[in-house]
Amino acid sequence: MSKHSLIENLKKQIEPIAEGLDYELYHIEFVKEGKENYLRIYIDSENGVSLEGCEKVSRAISELLDDIDPIQESYYLEVSSPGIDRVLYTDKHLEKYKSYNIVLNLYSPIDKKKKYEGELVDFNENEIDIKVEENIVTIPREKISKTTLKGEL
């Protein structure tokens, strides 16, 4: 099974578990770091994510994973909040954070810059518009390597 298929299959099964515990499934990734594999589950909630909440979701997901055994290799399960400087992966994430400050990292420079910071104004399937100082800058999505919420306390 490909990594993409694995993630999609896990999303379908983990999402109802997270929702049943009053959390949103924000993102899933399966990564290798050094010699170790990690299944990382990011959860979110309107009320924030506590350590106890992560533990509760982790136990429920762990039971599911023990039952369905979707990953043949050994791995560590990690459940956490996406954090204040969270990556915005989907249109749903972009919609939620319209009018917030974001950081766009680019694959290659546009106007000699590989990083743009500004207020998320709008987006569509092809572009993201951000307000930088008083100017609207339109960046093609294909040029963006990562979109991150600019965490501000």
Curated annotation (Swiss-Prot):
Matching HAMAP family: RimP (MF_01077)
Gene symbol of the encoding locus: rimP
GO biological process, one term: ribosomal small subunit assembly
Subcellular location: Cytoplasm
Keyword Cytoplasm among UniProt keywords: yes
Transmembrane segments: none
Described function: Required for maturation of 30S ribosomal subunits.
Main subcellular localisation: cytoplasm
One GO CC annotation: cytosol
Family, as annotated: Belongs to the RimP family.
Keyword Magnesium: no
SUPFAM superfamilies in UniProt: YhbC-like, C-terminal domain (SSF74942), YhbC-like, N-terminal domain (SSF75420)
Keyword field: Cytoplasm, Ribosome biogenesis
Organism: Clostridium botulinum (strain Kyoto / Type A2)
Protein name: Ribosome maturation factor RimP
Entry-linked InterPro entries: Ribosome_maturation_RimP (IPR003728), RimP_C (IPR028998), RimP_C_sf (IPR036847), RimP_N (IPR028989), RimP_N_sf (IPR035956)
